[in-house]
């Protein structure tokens, strides 16, 4: 697994400058990790709308890694790592994402909370709030 240069740079933009609300990463067939998409912090103005857009951007039948910058209480933000592995994803892809997860996380310093999600209920705002609190 090789991280494209944009992977770390985009994460640093989220962590240091808070430019992005979320980042979705994809492992390509050549085992290179790329930034598939990111959502800007003030995309729609409302936090709930931005979260919904992020959640709906996760593919229903493919694995992904995602980073989510969440703040339920002003000034108390958490950077969450999400290992997205829907039950309908191909077994080979699930194995690839599972076996590279720890190495990927080590490349991105500053992750505070980790989630493994197989459907959107695993990473609903309520589920995230319960886990963080």
From Swiss-Prot:
Q: By its UniProt entry, which SUPFAM superfamilies does this protein fall under?
A: Actin depolymerizing proteins
Q: Does the keyword Cytoplasm apply?
A: yes
Any one cellular component term from GO for this entry?
A: actin cytoskeleton
Q: Which residues form the ADF-H domain?
A: 1-133
Cysteines engaged in disulfide bonds, as pairs:
none
Give the matching InterPro entries.
ADF-H, ADF-H/Gelsolin-like_dom_sf, ADF/Cofilin
Provide this UniProt record's keywords sorted from A to Z: Actin-binding, Cytoplasm, Cytoskeleton
Localization of this protein? Cytoplasm, Cytoskeleton
Q: Which GO terms describe its biological process?
A: actin filament depolymerization
UniProt GO molecular function: actin binding
According to its UniProt entry, the function of this protein is described as: Actin-depolymerizing protein. Severs actin filaments (F-actin) and binds to actin monomers.
Its recorded name reads Putative actin-depolymerizing factor 11
Q: Which organism is it from?
A: Arabidopsis thaliana (Mouse-ear cress)
